[in-house]
Every structure is written in structure tokens, then in C-alpha cells.
């Protein structure tokens, strides 16, 4: 005990003496305790713990005693079955060959033609395939001589083929009067093949609908006249025609069937009222009829758990109904004389013996009986 007390005193002296030897010239500055207000932590929201309903085993109600209803025995007179006639002849198992039924002819059911509404496919726009211009050398193919009398060059009768309609605003249709314009006489000697560069003139896209088919009567077309004398065609320098501006073909609007999109459910976002100044723009008045009612999803209230009221099982004492005693009506048994049905002598159905080849099923031979 003494040694332990000394050790405690020494340890106390080691910690207390340095603090006791304080500097009296500079007394320690008293620092009042700083008041720290308690940090008010917001209450942590703990969602209500939805306690699962306590499983209470179903109260086992005692079985209601139902006294057995004593039904009087129903009198069933004994059915006197006539003796079944069993012929003593042991009929061998009748082999019924597989009846090959002919295929039952089922007349083709004439289904009425299912009406399929014509699918209105929008006209598929096929961009004009830029085919490179097929260069035909002028020597091999001389210019086709078209006699001016029989068939004027590019004679477009006003009835058979109307002039190509070009929008009058952008470019009026070039009207070539068939009467006033004489056939351009191109001497066959100095006429070179007119080379139309494919770059300067884009391929003319003529929609098949707007342009009626050019009717070329086969009778009026004279045979191609090939002059025997190969006269050199007159060389005309290529006139640099400005690129013919053809207005963009107004493509018919591609009919896209209205895709029946399901109504996009937008949850009612509680938007703040949009402030629209009355001077710049008055608030758009939307009649209440056109505006659908703002769908507010029903607040899913947790189901109020009402513990099942444990009603004590109503004990209904078994009503003892005395069995209704019905005295047995002594009905005399209806005597039915035994109806004698003579045994119907059915002639044995003759079935031709089916030949069974030994390959399919060899005959079963029993052991030889030795007397």
C-alpha cells in the first residue's frame, strides 16, 4: 500500500509542479468560455415506417355441428337383369385390317375476299439517276433526216400534247406556235451533231404524272431516211446557252399516315404562374372547355391499418332438429315379371381370314404335345 501511494504522489507531482510554477509577471489571460449556441439540426425526416400488418392467424372457428340428416333409405327394387347370354364359342381375336380411309374430300371453303383497304403509299421519290451522257460518235450515226413536209421537227399538236406547263411566275412556258414557226432547215452538209454537255444542262426531271405519255402514231412515222451521200454536217459552234433554269419540281407532299401516338402522359408539373406583362402581350385566354382538367394523381394515402376486431366466435348451439320421421310407406313392391328376352342369335360376322405373311408375324408354334 505504501509503495502504491508513493507512486501516485510522484505522478501527481510531475503533472502539478510545472503548472504550479507559473509565470507571475504575466498572469494567465482569463478566457471566458465561448458560448456556442447549440446547433439546431433540422429534424431528420423519417418516413413513417409502414409496419406490415401483423399476421394474425385466422381464428379457427369451431366447426358448426350439423347433425347428420338421417335420410330414409331409398327403396330401390332389385333390378332383375336377365342372364347375359355368353356364347360358349371362343371367338379368336378378330383381326381388323387397317381400314384405309380414302382422303375425305373437303371442298375448298370459298372464303369471301378479305377487303384490304388500299394502302396509300406515298409516291416514292426516286432521285434522277445521273447517267453519264452516252456519247455517240457523229460518224457512225449520221443525223436522222426528218423531212420537213411529212413530219415537222418537234411538232407538238395543241390537242394531243399540251405544252409543258412551267410556272408562269418563275418562267413562262416557251410557247412554240406550230403554224408560225417554220421548220428550221438545217442543211445536212454543215450540221454537226449538237453536243449538249451534261454538266451545263441537268437532267430534266419530268414527273410521270404531269407529263402525259407521248403518243407517237406508228403510221405517221416515216422510215428513217439515210442519204447515201455522206455529207459533212454543218459545223455550228456550240452556243453557250445559259443553264436553263427549271424551277424546282414541286414534289407532292409525301403522305405520311398519321402515326397514332399514344397520348404522352405529362405529370402535372406545378409551374409557377407565368407572368406576362399586360402591355407587351395580354395573357392568352384559354377557354376552360379546351383546356383539359389538370390531372392530379390521387395522393396515395397509406392504408389505415385497422386491426381486425377480434369478434368472439358467436357460438350458436346446434339446433337439434329431430329427424323428421316419415313412416315408411309400405308400397307393395311393383312386381315386374322377368322380361324374357330370347337370346338374339346374331349370325357370326364372317370376316375373311386375313393372310398374315410369315415375315411380318410368324405363327407362334407351341411345344409338341407327346401323348
Curated annotation (Swiss-Prot):
Q: Which domain of life is it from?
A: Eukaryota
What are the start and end residues of every segment in region (67 X 5 AA approximate tandem repeats of P-P-[IV]-[EY]-K)? 32-366
Q: Does the keyword Signal apply?
A: yes
This protein's GO CC annotations: extracellular region
Q: Indicate where this protein resides in the cell.
A: Secreted, Cell wall
One Pfam family assigned to this protein is Extensin_1
> What GO annotations for molecular function exist for this entry?
structural constituent of cell wall
Outline the segment boundaries, as ranges, of region: Disordered.
Answer: 49-317, 339-371
Signal peptide start-end: 1-22
Q: In which tissues is it expressed?
A: Expressed in hypocotyls, roots and mature root nodules.
Q: Which key words tag this protein in UniProt? A: Cell wall, Developmental protein, Repeat, Secreted, Signal
User: Which InterPro entries does the record cross-reference, listed alphabetically?
Assistant: Adhesive_plaq, Extensin-like, Proline-rich_CW_protein
Please classify the protein's predominant subcellular localization into one broad category. secreted
Protein family (similarity comment): Belongs to the plant proline-rich protein superfamily. ENOD12 family.
The role this protein plays is: This is a developmentally regulated putative cell wall protein.
Name of this protein: Repetitive proline-rich cell wall protein 2
Amino acid at each position: 500500500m505504501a509503495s502504491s501511494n508513493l507512486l501516485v504522489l510522484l505522478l501527481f507531482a510531475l503533472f502539478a509542479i510545472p503548472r504550479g510554477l507559473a509565470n507571475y509577471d504575466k498572469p494567465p489571460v482569463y478566457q471566458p468560455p465561448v458560448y456556442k449556441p447549440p446547433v439546431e439540426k433540422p429534424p431528420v425526416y423519417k418516413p413513417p415506417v409502414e409496419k406490415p400488418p401483423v399476421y394474425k392467424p385466422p381464428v379457427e372457428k369451431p366447426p358448426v355441428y350439423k347433425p347428420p340428416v338421417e335420410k330414409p333409405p331409398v327403396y330401390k327394387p332389385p333390378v332383375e337383369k336377365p342372364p347375359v347370354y355368353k356364347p360358349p364359342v371362343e371367338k379368336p381375336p378378330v383381326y381388323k385390317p387397317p381400314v384405309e380411309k380414302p382422303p375425305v374430300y373437303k371442298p375448298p371453303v370459298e372464303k369471301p375476299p378479305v377487303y384490304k383497304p388500299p394502302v396509300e403509299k406515298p409516291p416514292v421519290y426516286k432521285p434522277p439517276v445521273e447517267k453519264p451522257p452516252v456519247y455517240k460518235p457523229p460518224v457512225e450515226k449520221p443525223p436522222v433526216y426528218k423531212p420537213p413536209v411529212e413530219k415537222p421537227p418537234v411538232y407538238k399538236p395543241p390537242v394531243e400534247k399540251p405544252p409543258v406547263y412551267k410556272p408562269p411566275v418563275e418562267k413562262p412556258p416557251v410557247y412554240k406556235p406550230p403554224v408560225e414557226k417554220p421548220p428550221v432547215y438545217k442543211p445536212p452538209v454543215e450540221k454537226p451533231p449538237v453536243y449538249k454537255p451534261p454538266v451545263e444542262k441537268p437532267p430534266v426531271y419530268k414527273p410521270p404524272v404531269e407529263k402525259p405519255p407521248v403518243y407517237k402514231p406508228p403510221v405517221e412515222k416515216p422510215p428513217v431516211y439515210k442519204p447515201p451521200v455522206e455529207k459533212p454536217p454543218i459545223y455550228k459552234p456550240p452556243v453557250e446557252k445559259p443553264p436553263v433554269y427549271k424551277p424546282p419540281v414541286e414534289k407532292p407532299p409525301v403522305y405520311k399516315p398519321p402515326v397514332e401516338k399514344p397520348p404522352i402522359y405529362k405529370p402535372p408539373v406545378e409551374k409557377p404562374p407565368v407572368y406576362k406583362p399586360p402591355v407587351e402581350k395580354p395573357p392568352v385566354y384559354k377557354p376552360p372547355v379546351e383546356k383539359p382538367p389538370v390531372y392530379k394523381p390521387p395522393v396515395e394515402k397509406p392504408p389505415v391499418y385497422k386491426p381486425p376486431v377480434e369478434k368472439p366466435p358467436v357460438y350458436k348451439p346446434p339446433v337439434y332438429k329431430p329427424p323428421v320421421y316419415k313412416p315408411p310407406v309400405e308400397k307393395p313392391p311393383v312386381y315386374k315379371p322377368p322380361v324374357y328376352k330370347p337370346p338374339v342369335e346374331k349370325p357370326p360376322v364372317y370376316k375373311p381370314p386375313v393372310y398374315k405373311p410369315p415375315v411380318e408375324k410368324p405363327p407362334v408354334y407351341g411345344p409338341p404335345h407327346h401323348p
